[in-house]
Amino acid sequence: MDWGTLQSILGGVNKHSTSIGKIWLTVLFIFRIMILVVAAKEVWGDEQADFVCNTLQPGCKNVCYDHYFPISHIRLWALQLIMVSTPALLVAMHVAYRRHEKKRKFMKGEIKNEFKDIEEIKTQKVRIEGSLWWTYTTSIFFRVIFEAVFMYVFYIMYNGFFMQRLVKCNAWPCPNTVDCFISRPTEKTVFTVFMISVSGICILLNITELCYLFIRYCSGKSKRPV
């Protein structure tokens, strides 16, 4: 699946989202997917090529690079975006199932009076209620979990969010402790902090949307006749 396909699927989910959900999707597309596709390769394209160590020992440079960068930042962010977007696909499948059921009932004549034709069923906005409410709420909950887990993994794996100019490595087969230099550390630090900040904003938006959905759910129950 490429980014265009993912965008078209999530765009379909956006039609049935709350206002906060629409803001989250906008942030996801503009500040994460677009930035990752357009700018990430320019910033991180020289990762291993310009990782220089002051030794000529064969294999030392590769081992040190693997020690400090076990997973490429770009690949980790791409995996994060895929995992964060996956719960929204569950909502898309649930909406598609509901429409399929309505089409089936329409063809049988059970809901002929509710819709003019099948095209109206396709374009109708599906309300977030009933079982769809649970699917939608669960998807947001898992988005928060995935975002938090990836931020924690990123922090642990790279020992923080700031890129050092110089790192020391004594892994085998290096003959002793060698100095290794990272290319453009300031630029990479700024980019990393930006991506982490956007992840934090997405978490806040998801938590806000969860609170909104629960408040609306509770207020709806309180209005029902006893």
From Swiss-Prot:
Keyword field contains Cell membrane: yes
Assembly and oligomerization: A hemichannel or connexon is composed of a hexamer of connexins. A functional gap junction is formed by the apposition of two hemichannels. Forms heteromeric channels with GJB4. Interacts with CNST.
Physiological role: Structural component of gap junctions. Gap junctions are dodecameric channels that connect the cytoplasm of adjoining cells. They are formed by the docking of two hexameric hemichannels, one from each cell membrane. Small molecules and ions diffuse from one cell to a neighboring cell via the central pore.
Extracellular side: 41-73, 157-189
Protein name: Gap junction beta-2 protein
Naturally occurring in which organism (per UniProt): Rattus norvegicus
Pfam families: Connexin (PF00029)
Family affiliation: Belongs to the connexin family. Beta-type (group I) subfamily.
Location of this chain's protein in the cell: Cell membrane; Cell junction, Gap junction
Disulfide linkage: C53-C180, C60-C174, C64-C169
GO biological-process terms attached to the record: cell-cell signaling; cellular response to dexamethasone stimulus; cellular response to glucagon stimulus; cellular response to oxidative stress; decidualization; epididymis development; female pregnancy; gap junction assembly
MF (Gene Ontology): calcium ion binding; gap junction channel activity; gap junction channel activity involved in cell communication by electrical coupling; identical protein binding
SMART domains in alphabetical order: CNX, Connexin_CCC
GO cellular component, one term: gap junction
Topology in membrane: Multi-pass membrane protein
Chain positions recorded as Ca(2+) binding sites: E42, G45, E47
InterPro entries associated with the record: Connexin, Connexin26, Connexin_CCC, Connexin_CS, Connexin_N, Connexin_N_sf
Tissue: Liver, kidney, intestine, lung, spleen, stomach, testis and brain, but not heart and adult skeletal muscle.
Keywords carried by this UniProt record: Calcium, Cell junction, Cell membrane, Disulfide bond, Gap junction, Hearing, Membrane, Metal-binding, Transmembrane, Transmembrane helix
UniProt KW Flavoprotein keyword: no
Topological domains, Cytoplasmic: 14-20, 95-135, 211-226
Primary residence: membrane
Transmembrane segments: 21-40, 74-94, 136-156, 190-210
Membrane-embedded but not crossing: residue ranges: 2-13
